[in-house]
Amino acid sequence: MKKEKLLINAKRVLKNSYGPYSNYTVGSVLVAKDNKLFLGCNVENAGIQSICAERVAFTNAISSGYREFKEILVIGKNKNDKYLKETLPCGYCRQFMCEFCDKDFKIITYNEEEKTFKEYKLEELLPYNFNL
């Protein structure tokens, strides 16, 4: 999948993000094995734990019957509405991804200032995942 197409979709869904407590907004685009796209944005709540954009995209895909994935692109903004140089999944999201993705699953970040993409394998970001 072309990264530019993923970026356009990530920026679009980022606008729906709800982050009034952390002032940190995130958008993500998950790509299934058949190239279907699933979007996600973070949603914060004062009363319970928030849900990250990556897990929103995954649960959207899983509830639609998908279980096999190729890659995800993640972007974020800070409280000043400036794009972050790199937005990486939190530890909880990394472990969540391990449930559904192999070690070569790609995590793509984007640096808006430099107009560059960076790719990681899931295994690089979580080399020792929890397993039952």
Regions found by a protein language model. Name each.
Residues 2-16, 66-132:
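C-terminal binding/interaction regions
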Residues 19-22:
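Short loop/turn motifs at secondary-structure junctions and domain boundaries
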Residues 25-32:
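Short beta-strand scaffold segments in enzyme catalytic cores
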Residues 26, 48, 127-131:
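Short capping/connector residues at structural and topological boundaries
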Residues 36-37:
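Hydrophobic "anchor" residues
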Residues 41-56:
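Compact, glycine-rich, soluble single-domain proteins
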